[in-house]
């Protein structure tokens, strides 16, 4: 079950990293192997919009929108844990695995953003602040996700002023 939880969290990181939106993430539409399956109304983000879903039947509630996929992955892992509980009668180890999903996703998403932004060696706290600010800004400007991150790779280090990503201890 731990492997299923890890693979699901890793899959959600991969989807989010590239802007993939599954569209229908019911428990029967996710693989315990961490594979993308049964993606009927799937799509790819163009403008960075965490609220976007390609599923027109989900347009009202937007349960399966881009920005909600990690939470739905967690929900699905917890549903599997509930089903396994009926077989083992010991909820504690199952709950610990369900709880580990969020940390696994958070660490993977942090690594993915650090890679995309070229900030792998930056101070972790400051790097997360920069990434969070960027993710807040991108939807405001209707920025094409793929083009934006691809263009970052074209910037030469010597073309930009040095940015201090260390934590300011004076505040």
PLM ranges: what are they?
Residues 27-28, 32:
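Catalytic-loop Lys-Pro-X-Asn motif of eukaryotic-like protein kinases
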Residues 107, 111, 132-171:
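C-terminal, non-catalytic "cap/extension" segments appended to globular domains
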Residues 1-22, 33-124, 128-129, 133:
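ATP-dependent phospho-/nucleotidyl transfer catalytic cores
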């Amino acid at each position: 079950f731990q492997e299923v939880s890890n693979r699901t969290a890793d899959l959600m990181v991969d989807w989010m990293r590239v802007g993939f939106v599954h569209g229908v993430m019911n428990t029967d539409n996710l693989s315990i192997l961490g594979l993308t399956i049964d993606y009927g109304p799937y799509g790819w983000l163009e403008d960075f919009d965490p609220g976007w879903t390609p599923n027109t039947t989900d347009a009202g509630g937007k349960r399966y929108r881009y920005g909600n996929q990690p939470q739905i992955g967690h929900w699905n892992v917890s549903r599997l844990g509930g089903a396994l509980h009926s077989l083992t009668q010991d909820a504690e180890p199952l709950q610990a695995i369900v709880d580990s999903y969020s940390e696994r996703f958070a660490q993977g998403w942090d690594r993915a953003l650090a890679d995309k932004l070229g900030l792998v060696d930056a101070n972790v706290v400051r790097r997360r602040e920069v990434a969070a600010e960027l993710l807040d800004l991108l939807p405001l400007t209707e920025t094409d996700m793929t083009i934006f991150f691809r263009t970052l790779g074209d910037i030469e280090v010597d073309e930009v002023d040095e940015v201090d990503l260390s934590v300011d201890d004076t505040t």
